[in-house]
Amino acid sequence: MEIDVLGWVALLVVFTWSIAMVVWGRNGL
């Protein structure tokens, strides 16, 4: 279970970072 939680956390971080980069790029920051 600990590996499952770690995997979900890593996935969430990568997903959030990807969305942030797309939004920032669209805003021309």
UniProtKB/Swiss-Prot annotation:
It is a single-pass membrane protein. InterPro entries: Cytochr_b6-f_cplx_su8_sf, Cytochrome_b6-f_cplx_su8. GO terms for biological process: cytochrome complex assembly; photosynthesis. The chain crosses the membrane at residues 3-23. GO terms for molecular function: electron transporter, transferring electrons within cytochrome b6/f complex of photosystem II activity. It is found in: Cellular thylakoid membrane. Keywords: Electron transport, Membrane, Photosynthesis, Thylakoid, Transmembrane, Transmembrane helix, Transport. It comes from the Bacteria. One of its GO terms (cellular component) is cytochrome b6f complex. Belongs to the PetN family. Component of the cytochrome b6-f complex, which mediates electron transfer between photosystem II (PSII) and photosystem I (PSI), cyclic electron flow around PSI, and state transitions. The 4 large subunits of the cytochrome b6-f complex are cytochrome b6, subunit IV (17 kDa polypeptide, PetD), cytochrome f and the Rieske protein, while the 4 small subunits are PetG, PetL, PetM and PetN. The complex functions as a dimer. This is Cytochrome b6-f complex subunit 8. It comes from Mastigocladus laminosus. The gene is petN.
